Amino acid sequence: MGLPRADWAWIGEKTTEAFESPSEVRRITANSEIFKYFYDLVRENRRTGANEFVSGLTARAGSGSGLTDEELVFNFAGILAGGNETTRYTLAALTLELARHPDQWRRIAEGEVDPSVATEEGLRWSVPGMHVMRTATEAVRVGDAEVAPGERVVTWIGSANRDPEVFDAPDVFDVGRTGNRHVSFGAGRHVCLGSRLARLEITAYLRALRGMVTSVELNGPPRYNGSNFTWGLNELPAVLS
Ligand code: HEM
């Protein structure tokens, strides 16, 4: 996003706090600080035009068909949040499962399963974005439920990813699973903007691990965050040999 290097640590920590702080006040404060940061960036960039990413979007905003300042700020915050938490949770969850299932690790290490295939199982299994919500614009039936206009519907992605009608042995972690139709990136109009980048990162991680490491072992209890939205491991004491 072309943000100054000096701001990276601060903005990364603020994003984690905005989603995962146990204190509601700190979550709200962190969100406000992030919005103010991006609002200042948009205004500053109007003057200097120095940030290419912001300039690209503000140019579209100015064309009459694009985004308002408020929408720009929300989108910046969304891209930041989407990119910051999620991918690292899949990497950590994959590492944990590979430590728990040395047989699965060997399948990757010995070349039986390509890292890009194992990436999909890591995504199905880890579910860093736990749910998405939509508001019904018209009456609709979902399964056995009638949904009235204006009612909200939440889909729990972890549940969908273990749907026995879609996945064989859904509770089995199988790095070689094929036809892996998980919905970890959501679906439809708001499907994850960063899914290609995330897949690239996770596959690169597995390739690096395969090249550098013979075994993955835990040496302490995994510790998860307390969020029901962006959920994942905060701590994973492990030995990579
Ligand atoms: C394992 C990694 C990731 C997972 C599991 C994930 C998950 C998701 C999910 C479930 C949604 C849909 C939200 C909805 O339908 O309401 C979404 C949207 C989005 N993601 Fe990701 N994401 C990941 C990585 C990333 C990365 C790396 C970026 C950015 C660099 C990113 C940026 C976004 C953005 C901007 C949206 C909103 C798209 C829209 O509303 O049109 N995500 N993501």
Locate predicted features:
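Cytochrome P450
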Residues: 1-241
